[in-house]
């Protein structure tokens, strides 16, 4: 089975609770669509486990990009700090220099967009916040795009705004060659989105637009306490709190 999750934000215990719930095994594949680190208690512990896994595929999020930028340019640190870097820094700087280098090197090599995943006859395009504004049919990495496009792919809030319908139309036209491509993102918590849904207690739920080809999996784990996971084989949803 193939699963996707996003925006775990250092919640190591909740992540393992979810793996237990879906009965995740060596025969399965898990895509993590950005934002493993920051805010929660064990971001580096979680990241190291994902790095060592053979069947977990990590797609870069804006929080990992902030970490990379801060390592290169100290002037970028304030932005990272204001977005919850403290737990990540605490764990990261307790590691050896070699281990720190290994982590940064891993993140530099992570994809930012995977447009061609086919599961049970359905095609999926994965990116943390936004698809690229032009057609792609292969995995894209940080160094493949300009800084502006990198920012848009990892940081865009356009799918949160009321005018997201126009973007959905643009996306649908761009990928009409596939007829049935579904874009899956995170980044914007579903309770904050114009198309988002919640449970009876205000907890986030995996949300989609009316046509179903835009899906957001960021249930706001660090805010609402809900971590959601989508199984792509049959589109079944799983949640832990």
Question: Where in the sequence are the language-model features?
Answer:
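N-terminal active-site segment of His-dependent metallophosphoesterases
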Residues: 1-49, 53
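Active-site-proximal beta-strand elements of phosphoester/diester hydrolases
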Residues: 1-9, 123-130, 215-217
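Residue-level marker for buried hydrophobic side chains located in beta-strands
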Residues: 4, 30-32, 58-59, 125, ...
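Divalent metal-coordination and catalytic microenvironments
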Residues: 7, 35, 50, 61-62, ...
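Catalytic metal-binding/acid-base residues of hydrolase active sites
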Residues: 9, 37, 63-64, 130-132, ...
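Active-site neighborhood of divalent metal-dependent phosphoester bond hydrolases
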Residues: 43-116, 120-124, 140, 149, ...
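His/acidic metal-ligating clusters that form di-metal
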Residues: 99-132, 136-195
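Conserved beta-sheet core of the metallophosphoesterase superfamily
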Residues: 167-240
């Amino acid at each position: 089975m193939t699963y996707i999750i996003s925006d775990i934000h250092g919640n190591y215990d909740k992540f393992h609770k979810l793996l237990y719930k879906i009965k995740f095994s060596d025969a399965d594949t898990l895509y993590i669509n950005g934002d493993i680190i920051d805010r929660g208690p064990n971001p580096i512990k979680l990241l190291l486990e994902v790095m060592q896994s053979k069947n977990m595929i990590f797609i870069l999020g804006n929080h990992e990009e902030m970490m990379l930028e801060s390592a290169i340019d100290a002037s970028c640190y304030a932005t990272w700090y204001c977005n919850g870097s403290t737990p990540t820094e605490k764990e990261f700087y307790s590691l050896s220099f070699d281990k720190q280098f290994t982590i940064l090197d891993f993140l530099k090599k992570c994809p930012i967009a995977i447009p061609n995943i086919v599961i049970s006859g359905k095609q999926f395009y994965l990116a943390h916040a936004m698809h690229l504004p032009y057609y792609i049919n292969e995995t894209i990495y940080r160094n493949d795009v300009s800084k502006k496009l990198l920012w848009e792919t990892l940081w865009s809030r356009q799918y949160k705004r009321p005018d997201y319908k126009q973007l959905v139309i643009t996306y649908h036209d761009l990928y009409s060659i596939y007829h049935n491509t579904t874009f899956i993102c995170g980044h914007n918590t579903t309770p904050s989105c114009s198309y988002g849904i919640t449970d009876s207690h205000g907890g986030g739920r995996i949300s989609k637009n009316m046509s179903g080809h835009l899906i957001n999996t960021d249930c706001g784990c660090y805010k609402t306490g809900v971590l959601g996971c989508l199984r792509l084989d049959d589109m079944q949803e799983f949640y832990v709190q």
